[in-house]
């Protein structure tokens, strides 16, 4: 039961932060691209990689922390379904360049962010 509670708490925090990121990124950056999804995926990729390296290689923590961060928080904070839906919406508007840019930015920057998280965690 403890595992489920840890996942639920992490998931609740991730979901709320995801919502707030979407709201405030639209206000700050506009809506030309789905910036909120881009931000949560790039930041979430970094967080997941960084903390998994810390948990697996550097720190001796209760495995519940991995569930909290990886399954709970990052599981609700990041999303592939939003990228898919938002990109298809852009395609349906006929803006193929913007759709490709959205895909490239989400996957390219998320990959680089995850790599940076691993490198930074290993430097600690």
From Swiss-Prot:
Membrane topology of this protein: Multi-pass membrane protein
Entry's family note: Belongs to the fluoride channel Fluc/FEX (TC 1.A.43) family.
Catalytic reaction list: fluoride(in) = fluoride(out)
Function: Fluoride-specific ion channel. Important for reducing fluoride concentration in the cell, thus reducing its toxicity.
Residues that span the membrane, as ranges: 4-24, 36-56, 63-83, 100-120
Organism of derivation: Sulfurihydrogenibium sp. (strain YO3AOP1)
Main location: membrane
Name by which UniProt lists this protein: Fluoride-specific ion channel FluC
Subcellular localization(s) per the UniProt record: Cell inner membrane
InterPro entries on file: FluC
Binding site for Na(+): 75, 78
GO CC, any one term: plasma membrane
Alphabetical GO biological process terms: cellular detoxification of fluoride
Activity control note: Na(+) is not transported, but it plays an essential structural role and its presence is essential for fluoride channel function.
Molecular function as annotated in GO: fluoride channel activity; metal ion binding
HAMAP family: FluC
Lineage: Bacteria, Pseudomonadati, Aquificota, Aquificia, Aquificales
A family per Pfam: CRCB
Keywords: Cell inner membrane, Cell membrane, Ion channel, Ion transport, Membrane, Metal-binding, Sodium, Transmembrane, Transmembrane helix, Transport
